Curated annotation (Swiss-Prot):
PANTHER family: 60S RIBOSOMAL PROTEIN L38, LARGE RIBOSOMAL SUBUNIT PROTEIN EL38
Any single Gene Ontology cellular-component annotation: cytosolic large ribosomal subunit
Lineage: Eukaryota, Metazoa, Ecdysozoa, Nematoda, Chromadorea
Protein name, as recorded: Large ribosomal subunit protein eL38
Gene3D superfamilies: 3.30.720.90
GO MF: structural constituent of ribosome
Pfam families associated with the record: Ribosomal_L38e
Family: Belongs to the eukaryotic ribosomal protein eL38 family.
Annotated keywords: Ribonucleoprotein, Ribosomal protein
Amino acid sequence: MPKEIKEIKDFLVKARRKDAKSVKIKKNSNNTKFKVRCASYLYTLVVADKDKAEKLKQSLPPGIQVKELK
């Protein structure tokens, strides 16, 4: 089941959880979507600012698998 997250800090907390398996990054012309797969939910964060999206990408935990989609 998907759930949308509005705050970047909440997304980073979810990404650092033990059951977080992977993060998918999907870039459009208008915004960037970050999707973290946990055990029960797929959490989604939509970021419109490209600079914030780049900073968020760099602040993801190092042990998690990151996959970039088109």
